[in-house]
Amino acid sequence: MITIKKGLDLPIAGGPEQVIHDGPAIKHVATLGEEYIGMRPTMRIKVGDKVAKGQVIFEDKKNPGVKYTALASGTVTEINRGAKRVLQSVVIEIEGNDAVAFDKFDASQLDSLSAEQVRNNLIESGMWTALRTRPFSKVPAVDASPAGIFVTAIDTNPHAANPALVIAGHKDDFANGLKVLAKLTEGKVYLCKAPGADIPAANAEVHEFGGVHPAGLPGTHIHFILPASVTRTVWHVGYQDVIAIGQLFTTGELNNNRVIAIAGPKAVKPRLVRTLLGASIETLTTGEVAEGKVRKVSGSVLHGRTATGPHAYLGRYHLQVSLLEEDTEKEFIGWILPGSNKFSITRAFLGHLSPRRLFNMTTSTGGSDRAMVPIGNYERVMPLDILPTMLLRDLVSGDVDGAVALGALELDEEDLALCTFVCPGKYDYGSYLRGCLDTVEREG
């Protein structure tokens, strides 16, 4: 077992009850284009078209052969575009149960499938997009093969669902998904889970991770087991996508059901709910939000995105909806007050005297932008074998060569989310990292 000691379990109120409930009926779902890094769509549908679940709605001209399919059957009601005609979202109003039928196999046949059969079924169904690469965190090319595949069956994000609870009702599907994934690599499938979690491990090498966040991030697992580099590409996939892959191959139908957490300080009743990929967050949170100004976030409070306008839908890789108070008020001489109701990793406030207390955190950054101050905060929350202060300095200054030499290629934005949270200078290091990775990929 690998125990993560450097990191932070965010003491934020509003954790969900670990019991799965049925969510509200969803009337609209959306595929969000900007979630797929570097993707440039070739549209196969237009507003007003009727689509079946699993039907191709666009393909990626930058990554030929990668297909994106409809999350539900119904009518395309919106195709939203932003600056420079970047695809923001394709919205479908759900109607009927029409679905494309894909190849299906008996569970006993999965071990004898060829890599080509597996690859084709994943591509045609759109489930290929569940896979992501390191470096760069992109959907892999359809003819690529990884050095290994990491299955993330642990989640240490604040307010996350317990993966073992979700998998418990789908153990056969999960095991079948692992068998299928093993066909895509000549290396190993690495199943990463919490210590003692009852999770099937068919055809996979098991690694247990304990300790504080980011013990549950794929970047942490990859770093300690099979580090990614310019010459070594690995893939990772979430546990609920593994379940969906297993169901795809045994039923021939695309399963877009997901279990997510609706939680946060402004959640009326934080809990786990069953819903659909791409579900309307407005519908999901009806009756779930406390009074006042609230920011709805798709994903974790550490690395989610504001869900408004054309982006007001559950993200493809998100398993949480976080509800936070929209705090726009400035606190007079707040820096000098005792702060018994505030959290600080540097013990700047009296709140540290209650180590088990949960705080009603808001969207406030606690001050304006300022210079990057290296006072040891980054080292406290970075468990990877890198020099965080030096790396972050190079990212901010635009020194791409220096950042790559210090390990930037191993990372994704979520791996630097804690550094952003504890930064006195209020820097969003994830955006700097993405700029660095884009430069490396563009210039080779």
UniProtKB/Swiss-Prot annotation:
Keywords: Ion transport, NAD, Sodium, Sodium transport, Translocase, Transport, Ubiquinone
Alphabetical GO biological process terms: sodium ion transport
Enzyme nomenclature, EC number: 7.2.1.1
Keyword Lipid biosynthesis: no
Reaction equation(s) it catalyzes: a ubiquinone + n Na(+)(in) + NADH + H(+) = a ubiquinol + n Na(+)(out) + NAD(+)
Superkingdom of origin: Bacteria
Molecular-function GO term, any one: oxidoreductase activity, acting on NAD(P)H, quinone or similar compound as acceptor
Quaternary assembly: Composed of six subunits; NqrA, NqrB, NqrC, NqrD, NqrE and NqrF.
Function recorded in the entry: NQR complex catalyzes the reduction of ubiquinone-1 to ubiquinol by two successive reactions, coupled with the transport of Na(+) ions from the cytoplasm to the periplasm. NqrA to NqrE are probably involved in the second step, the conversion of ubisemiquinone to ubiquinol.
PANTHER family: NA(+)-TRANSLOCATING NADH-QUINONE REDUCTASE SUBUNIT A (PTHR37839:SF1)
Family statement drawn from the similarity comment of this UniProt entry: Belongs to the NqrA family.
Protein name: Na(+)-translocating NADH-quinone reductase subunit A
The organism of origin for this protein: Shewanella amazonensis (strain ATCC BAA-1098 / SB2B)
